[in-house]
Regions:
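C-terminal catalytic domain of Rieske-type non-heme iron oxygenases
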Residues: 57, 73-163
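Residue-level signal for tight coil/turn positions that link beta-strands
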Residues: 33, 42, 62, 103, ...
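N-terminal pre-ligand scaffold of iron-sulfur
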Residues: 1-49, 54-61, 67-69
Length: 163
């Protein structure tokens, strides 16, 4: 077992979909090794209470509610990009699922650079693989040929702010 304390990166973290937080209700989730209370007031503003601290910045964007985490209590230094498709009637509404992943979120972004796992894990051995890290974003493009998922696969993934 590791005796080091959990550390969480600085950045925006999604707490849930906007519709998960109706007016007048308070939801409780666990994150950052704390109980987090999320409330939407009668004037539709979201507040977040992390172990009695209500100063955490909150953002509603792309139909998600996010909270800014920074151990040094610095203000946010970026805002995620607005995704126009989240507000378009051309797309159906999306859902969100929550499940426990027993590792630190920093390890998830490491997956982006591990091109060797795509064959054995996803049954999609890569043919082309490209990554770019710029400011708070990480973009990956990959081409693959999978007998299960289909030929000539193309994937573009973009991650913003922590993992």
């Amino acid at each position: 077992m590791n005796d080091l304390p959990d550390r969480f990166p600085r950045g925006w973290f999604v707490l849930g979909h906007q519709r998960d937080f109706p007016v007048g209700e308070t939801k409780t989730i666990f994150g950052f090794n704390n109980k987090i209370l999320i409330s939407r007031s009668e004037d539709s503003l979201i507040t977040v209470d992390v172990d009695g601290d209500t100063s955490w910045p909150v953002l509603e964007l792309n139909q998600m509610v996010m909270v800014w985490h920074d151990l040094e209590k610095q203000d946010p230094d970026f805002i995620p990009d607005k995704i126009d498709a989240c507000y378009s009637d051309d797309w159906s509404d999306y859902g969100m699922a929550s499940f426990l992943v027993k590792n630190n979120c920093r390890e998830l972004i490491d997956n982006m650079a591990d091109k060797g796992h795509f064959g054995p894990v996803h049954q999609a051995p890569f043919e082309g693989f490209w990554n770019e890290a710029k400011d708070h974003t990480y973009t990956q493009e990959m081409t693959a040929d999978s007998p299960i998922l289909g030929r000539d696969l193309f994937s573009q993934a973009r991650y913003e702010g922590p993992a």
